[in-house]
Regions:
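Active-site beta->alpha loop and helix N-cap motifs at the rims of alpha/beta catalytic domains
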Residues: 2-132, 136
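Catalytic alpha/beta core domains of metabolic enzymes, predominantly
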Residues: 116-241
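Conserved small/polar residues in nucleotide/adenosyl-binding loops
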Residues: 244
Length: 245
C-alpha cells in the first residue's frame, strides 16, 4: 500500500520526464508514489508506447509506485484489450480509472490490483460495489489548470468525508512552485484556494484541515526548499492517523 499520509507524491509527464528526473532521483528507493497520465493526446506520437514503457519500468526499478491515469484512449494507443495486463507490462502499481468503463469492468480490475477512482465523478453506489470487491481502492480528486475552476472548501471537505466514510483512502493535488505546467502556468491545485500558495502550506492544509490520505504535487517542478519543508512537516507532525502501508 501507499506510505501515506506522511509522505509526498509526484506527478510525472512524459514530455518533461528528462527535466523532472533530477528531482525524482532524490526519492529513489522510498516507495514514493508517482502519478502519470497515459492518455494525454498531445504527447502521442510513433514512439509514445515505447517511451511510456521505458519510463514506467525505470520508475518501478528505482522503487517508485506508479499510478497511471487510463481511459479507453489508453487502450487504443497501446493496442491492448486488458488494462491489467498492460499494467503488468509497464510495471504499474495502480490504475486510476478515468472515463469509459462500467462498474463491473472497474470491479473486475479492482479484484486484481489497486484501483484509484475519480473522486469527482464516482457515485455512492459505484463506490460501495467497487470497494466491496477490490483489494485496495482509493479515490483521487482532480487538479485544475485554470483559475477559478478548482474545488471550493466545502465541496472538497464534504466529498472527501463521504468517500472516507465508505472506506476509501482519498488523494488530492497541490501546486508546484519552481516549474509550472503549461499552457496556462497558473499551478495545478485541487483546491482553488491553494492556487499561488506555497506547496508546503497547501500540503499542510490538505493533511490537517481536510484529512487527506495522500497528497501529490501536480506541477512538474518543486523547489528543494519546499520539498524539504514538506519532509520536515511529515517528520515533525507525525499526523495521528494510521498509515495505509
Amino acid at each position: 500500500m501507499l506510505p501515506l499520509p506522511n509522505s509526498l507524491g509526484f506527478s510525472l509527464y512524459l514530455s518533461t520526464f528528462a527535466g523532472q528526473w533530477s528531482t525524482l532521483a532524490g526519492w529513489t528507493g522510498t516507495g514514493t508514489p508517482v502519478f502519470l497520465s497515459l492518455h494525454i493526446s498531445e504527447e502521442f506520437d510513433e514512439t509514445y508506447c515505447r517511451r511510456a514503457e521505458e519510463v514506467c519500468c525505470m520508475l518501478a526499478y528505482h522503487g517508485f509506485r506508479v499510478i497511471a491515469d487510463v481511459s479507453r484512449k489508453t487502450m487504443e494507443q497501446f493496442g491492448c484489450a486488458d488494462l491489467v495486463e498492460l499494467a503488468k507490462q509497464l510495471e504499474l502499481w495502480a490504475l486510476r480509472i478515468d472515463y469509459g468503463f462500467t462498474r463491473n469492468e472497474i470491479s473486475a480490475m479492482a479484484e486484481k490490483m489497486p484501483i484509484v477512482l475519480n473522486a469527482s465523478t464516482v457515485t455512492a453506489e459505484d463506490t460501495a460495489v467497487i470497494a466491496g470487491r477490490g483489494r485496495e481502492v482509493y479515490a483521487m480528486h482532480n487538479f485544475y489548470p485554470r483559475p477559478e475552476t478548482g474545488l471550493d472548501e466545502d465541496y472538497l471537505l464534504a466529498t472527501t468525508r463521504t468517500l472516507q466514510s465508505a472506506g476509501l483512502k482519498v488523494l488530492a493535488f497541490i501546486p508546484g512552485d519552481e516549474w509550472l505546467r503549461g499552457p496556462v502556468f497558473e499551478g495545478l491545485p485541487t483546491l482553488e484556494a491553494h492556487r499561488g500558495m506555497l506547496p508546503s502550506a497547501a500540503f499542510a492544509d490538505l493533511a490537517i484541515r481536510y484529512g487527506m490520505d495522500g497528497i501529490f504535487v501536480a506541477d512538474p517542478g518543486l523547489s528543494r526548499t519546499e520539498a524539504n519543508r514538506i519532509r520536515m512537516f511529515c517528520q515533525e507532525t507525525k499526523v495521528d492517523r494510521k498509515s495505509v502501508v
